[in-house]
């Protein structure tokens, strides 16, 4: 079974989502189904069908999270050898060498990736180019719109 790399905060987020789904969403949906059943004929009961559809979605998500939690490889970046190398979990400051713009990314697992929050998947082209390199080095990212060159300004183990 393949392990899934994730940061400590990413694992906590999944655990919190699982608790919310089990403790809040599941009971609410069961109640919605019971209420909809009281309205009579189930064949034409839109509320009942909507609640059953939502139940299927929530149960599927619960199973997905439970499966992932059993395969997580939780990586506490603060415990890693802080040698200035870009590795999973590090926060990396970059200088785009074509336009001198600076950007900061944290390299995280698939479930944590959120480009708007500066969190990029460890499988993304940028992360793959950065991994193993260190402060002061230049990397080339093979992006869909062409190659982009970056200088690694700083690597933080937050």
What are these regions (language model features)?
Residues 18, 22-25, 69-73, 134:
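Conserved NTP-handling cores and scaffolds of large molecular machines
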Residues 75-157:
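Non-DNA-binding regulatory cores of transcription-related proteins
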Residues 1, 16, 37, 43, ...:
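Residue-level signal for pocket-adjacent positions within structured domains
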């Amino acid at each position: 079974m393949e392990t899934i790399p994730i940061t400590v905060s990413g694992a906590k987020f999944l655990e919190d989502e699982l608790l919310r789904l089990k403790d809040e969403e599941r009971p609410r949906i069961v109640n919605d189904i019971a209420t909809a059943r009281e309205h009579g004929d189930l064949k034409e009961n839109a509320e009942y069908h909507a609640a059953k559809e939502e139940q299927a979605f929530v149960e599927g998500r619960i199973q997905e999270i439970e499966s992932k939690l059993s395969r997580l490889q939780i990586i506490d970046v603060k415990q890693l050898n802080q040698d200035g190398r870009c590795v999973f979990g590090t926060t990396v400051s970059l200088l785009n060498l074509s336009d001198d713009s600076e950007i900061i990314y944290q390299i995280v697992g698939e479930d944590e990736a959120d480009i708007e929050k500066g969190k990029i998947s460890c499988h993304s082209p940028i992360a793959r180019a950065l991994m193993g390199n260190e402060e002061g080095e230049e990397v080339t990212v093979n992006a869909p719109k062409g190659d982009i060159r970056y200088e690694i300004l700083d690597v933080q183990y937050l």
